[in-house]
């Protein structure tokens, strides 16, 4: 039996071949010679213990011979680390019969060491040299880890703790890292600190002026009262304007139109008054007025043009004559009424009767205003009706003019041709025929 890995080739059997149990020729005192037993005991326990063991005949319990001292020297387990271990050098490195808690085994030389005062002194020296930027790069961390025999995690943790400690002690001499720096750009430099200092100086300079302004405000309480009254008046005016906008938009339109007409009428008068010759000024003023008159209706017509429904503008263009008459601008109130009443749909007074409202098609409830032919024919006849019927504004006409006679004759002819128009705006007995005629008229207007 040989064990070359243990350092010896064979083991001699302790018991001889002629044992008492085997051969029965020898006695128990001849189991092993005294010299062999003493040699084995002396190699294991030392000379005094070996003599005592041999005297008491313990040779049967020692399976090793004198040539095989397995434990020649034993070091103490409780001495310094430099002393030899419990195991003999002849044995190979043992494999652990358990899994260690960490990633390193107990006797592994790569196991991280605790940070000692000597290892952290190197890190402190590097930190003192880089007080303005205490953020080591990856290469610097690797270099410091090799020098101090520490891991990268330990080095990074130490620097983080050092920066936190300096920050608590108000000994920061570096600019904090911004978000752009974390993305890979350069770290904060001295220029950023200068910018912060400049901002602080500007704030300190502004503090004095702010204090002076606050003192002036405290010394002059009347200014606050006046400002409050101004703001209140302004808010009241704004609120009143908003109320007027909600309630009376037509009044504002009237005011604007009247203002324009006053300006147009005052301009030629001023020009006439400033002229030196009275005789020359009068025809000039009359000429200016004549020039102003045809140009003024487009201004009036342009204002409500945006509010016209498309269907009524088409109806007007289809029914207007080739030479529409132009009424001179004699009064501002009549023109403003025309502006308001142009092309609007209003409810007929006949809607008060249930017979008119209960029909399937109530075309007679709506009255079409400011259509050229209808206004010419109905402006005279319907003014004679009572307050219950709809009244139509009539354009001012000059007295004793030939145009008025022709217009009246044309209106009489239209009334004879279209008798339905007299009954379209007031309740009559024959409703079915009137309903059909009104529907035909409205459909013709809409199609045109």
Curated annotation (Swiss-Prot):
Residues 108-170 bind DNA. SUPFAM superfamilies: Homeodomain-like. Keywords: Activator, Developmental protein, Differentiation, DNA-binding, Homeobox, Neurogenesis, Nucleus, Repressor, Transcription, Transcription regulation. Residues 171-250, 387-410 are annotated as: Disordered. One of its GO terms (biological process) is positive regulation of DNA-templated transcription. PROSITE patterns: HOMEOBOX_1 (PS00027), HOMEOBOX_2 (PS50071). Residues 195-222, 238-248 have a biased composition (Acidic residues). The keyword Cytoplasm does not apply. It is found in: Nucleus. GO terms for cellular component: cytoplasm; nucleus. Residues 223-237, 396-406 have a biased composition (Basic and acidic residues). Gene3D superfamilies: Homeodomain-like. It comes from the Eukaryota. The keyword Transcription applies. It holds the Pfam family Homeobox_KN. One of its GO terms (molecular function) is DNA binding. Expressed in the neural plate in overlapping patterns with other irx members, which all share an anterior border of expression. Outside the nervous system and at tailbud stages, expressed in the developing otic vesicle, branchial arches, prospective heart region and pronephros. Belongs to the TALE/IRO homeobox family. Acts partially redundantly with other irx members in neural patterning. Required for formation of the posterior forebrain, midbrain, hindbrain, and to a lesser extent, spinal cord. Both up-regulates and down-regulates gene expression during neural development. Acts early in neural plate development to induce proneural gene expression and specify a neural precursor state. Also up-regulates repressors that prevent neuronal differentiation. This is Iroquois-class homeodomain protein irx-3. It comes from Xenopus tropicalis (Western clawed frog).
């Amino acid at each position: 039996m040989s064990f070359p890995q243990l350092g010896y080739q064979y083991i001699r059997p302790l018991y001889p071949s002629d044992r008492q149990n085997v051969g029965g020729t020898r006695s128990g005192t001849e189991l092993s010679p005294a010299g062999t037993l003493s040699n084995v005991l002396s190699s294991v326990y030392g000379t005094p213990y070996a003599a005592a063991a041999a005297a008491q005949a313990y040779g049967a319990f020692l399976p090793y011979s004198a040539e095989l001292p397995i434990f020649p020297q034993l070091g103490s387990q409780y001495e310094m680390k430099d002393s030899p271990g419990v195991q003999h050098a002849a044995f190979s490195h043992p494999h652990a019969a358990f899994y260690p808690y960490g990633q390193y085994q107990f006797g592994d030389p790569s196991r991280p060491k605790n940070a000692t005062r000597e290892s952290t002194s190197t890190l402190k020296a590097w930190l003192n040299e880089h007080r303005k930027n205490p953020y080591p790069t990856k290469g610097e961390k690797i270099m410091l880890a090799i020098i101090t025999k520490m891991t990268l995690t330990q080095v990074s943790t130490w620097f983080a703790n050092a920066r936190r400690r300096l920050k608590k002690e108000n000994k920061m001499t570096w600019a904090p890292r911004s978000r752009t720096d974390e993305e890979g750009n350069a770290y904060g430099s001295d220029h950023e600190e200068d910018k912060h200092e400049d901002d602080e100086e500007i704030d300190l300079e502004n503090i004095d002026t702010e204090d002076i302004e606050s003192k002036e405000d405290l010394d002059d309480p009347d200014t606050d009262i006046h400002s409050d009254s101004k703001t209140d008046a302004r808010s009241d005016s704004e609120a009143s304007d908003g109320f007027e906008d909600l309630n009376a938009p037509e009044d504002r339109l009237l005011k604007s139109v009247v203002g324009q007409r006053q300006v147009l009428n005052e301009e030629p008068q001023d020009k006439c008054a400033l002229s030196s010759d009275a005789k020359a000024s009068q025809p000039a003023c009359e000429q200016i007025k004549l020039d102003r008159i045809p140009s003024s209706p487009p201004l009036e017509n342009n204002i409500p043009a945006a509010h016209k429904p498309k269907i009524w503008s088409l109806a007007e263009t289809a029914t207007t004559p080739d030479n529409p008459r132009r009424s001179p601008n004699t009064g501002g109130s009549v023109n403003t009424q025309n502006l308001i009443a142009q092309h609007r749909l209003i409810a007929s007074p006949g809607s008060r009767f249930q017979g008119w409202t209960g029909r399937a098609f109530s075309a007679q409830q709506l009255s079409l205003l400011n259509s050229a032919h209808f206004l010419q024919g109905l402006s005279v006849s319907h003014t004679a009706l009572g307050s219950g019927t709809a009244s139509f504004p009539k354009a001012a006409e000059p007295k004793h003019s030939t145009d008025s006679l022709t217009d009246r004759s044309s209106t009489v002819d239209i009334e004879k041709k279209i008798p339905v128009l007299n009954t379209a705006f007031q309740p009559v007995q024959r409703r079915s025929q009137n309903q059909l005629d009104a529907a035909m008229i409205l459909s013709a207007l809409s199609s045109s």
